[in-house]
Regions:
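Cysteine-rich micro-motifs
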Residues: 25-33
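Disulfide-bonded cysteines in secreted/extracellular proteins and peptides
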Residues: 18-20, 29-30, 55
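Short Cys/His-rich zinc-binding micro-motifs
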Residues: 8-24
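Fe(II)/2-oxoglutarate oxygenase catalytic core
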Residues: 1-11, 32-198, 204-222
Length: 222
């Protein structure tokens, strides 16, 4: 039996002290609704981390590649001896087979960790092999935390992944929708080609990619 490692959720009360240690209230600091606010503590954005030329080259290649829908276990059809999967209604996106270009994706993530994450979060022991997601019209990724999930019986989160930092690199130019929303932090990010977006993977940083209304978006994930 696997032991669950439970994590107490942050209070998310705007009238209580912020998690960042600034001494300010949460609602006046990392969850501020001000239009001139900075990104919350734990979010790092580097514009043009990847050149537009590299973005276009990877998108041209990805457009020709096969892709598979993200799946989830179908508990109604699965048996102890056979696991059956189905399309996940909350994750309407495809993982692209990058084949010979996978080494380029690995190098981008490695550089992000060495040049950016090491200064902001500390040195990484390892990184997950990155994969490329393709979102088309109607595509979305529902609310979730990357490394934790919620146990309603205990009113606590528990770890499901050995991930401390999430890394996204956006490649696409012509799309509408798909903004990245952090619910508890009241923070919205509009992706742009070449941008590196990093954030802490725990429950405070629960997020969702909203539905796309036009075009195709590619996002490199690790």
């Amino acid at each position: 039996m696997t032991t669950r490692h439970y994590v107490k959720p942050f209070h998310c009360n705007p009238a209580q002290p912020c998690y960042c240690g600034s001494g300010a209230l949460f609602g006046d600091c990392c969850a501020s609704v001000s239009e001139r606010r900075e990104p919350p503590q734990g979010v790092v954005i580097v514009n043009n981390f990847i050149s537009k030329t590299d973005c276009r080259r990877l998108v041209r290649y990805a457009d020709k590649q096969k892709a598979a829908w993200l799946m989830v276990r179908d508990d109604k059809k699965s048996t102890p001896g056979k696991s059956v999967e189905k399309r996940d209604s909350g994750r309407v996106t495809q993982q692209v087979e990058m084949d010979k270009h996978q080494s380029f994706l690995n190098d981008f993530i490695r550089r992000a960790l060495l040049e950016v994450a090491s200064r902001k979060f500390g040195a990484a022991d390892f990184f997950e092999i990155p994969y490329l997601l393709r979102y088309k019209v109607g595509g979305k990724y529902g609310e979730h935390a990357d490394s934790e999930t919620y146990d309603p019986d205990k009113s606590l989160f528990y770890r499901i992944s050995d991930r401390d930092i999430s890394v996204l690199i956006y490649l696409s130019f012509d799309f509408v929708g798909g903004v990245l929303t952090f619910i508890s932090l009241i923070y919205i990010y509009h992706p742009s080609a070449g941008d590196l977006f990093m954030f802490t993977s725990g429950n405070l940083f629960m997020h969702q990619a909203q539905s796309f209304t036009r075009g195709t978006k590619y996002a490199l994930v690790s």
